[in-house]
């Protein structure tokens, strides 16, 4: 608890320092960008959007501002604006893996499964060592009914991060759908051990502790 209070005090000091610096240099894209990040951490999303937009005004090539702007729009449920922001990021840097993976995620939320998977695949082509993206791609394969590919991608995610609870949960569902209940139980227990809230009915069915 004491450590958390110290972090909050430090965060507040940084926030106030950024605002003070911005008064002195109001046309600084990095300051607007960093203040946008600070507002996002404080859950002040509208203010965060304004700061990222101002950062883009002063530096139209600041790709990270577009990506973070897209992330805020996603948190607000504005998928169209999220997609547009990440597409603009990719116009600046076509090989930015985070922009591709974020775009893929938003497209899947819109129901565009194949387009979203293409975004994940492009992100992994650029940087194969992204456990979260492999897990998301595995989840998309599961939605398509391709269980072997779903299992493959989630196992690759665990190669990168053996403690990735979501990958274990995804594998429990893929193995269960495949009929391999022993493997499903193993991953159910691992996901639970790592703190993931596994579906209680499925956990009971598998005898998962």
Name each model-derived stretch:
Residues 64, 97-98, 131-132, 165-166, ...:
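Boundary/linker segments of alpha-helical solenoid repeat arrays
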Residues 30-41, 64-75, 98-109, 132-142, ...:
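Conserved alpha-helical positions within TPR/SEL1-like repeat arrays
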Residues 6-20, 42-54, 75-88, 109-122, ...:
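Structural signature of tandem alpha-helical TPR/SEL1-like repeats
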Residues 176, 181-188, 198-202, 206-209:
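Alpha-helical protein-protein interaction modules
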Residues 2-38:
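N-terminal segments that cap or nucleate solenoid repeat domains
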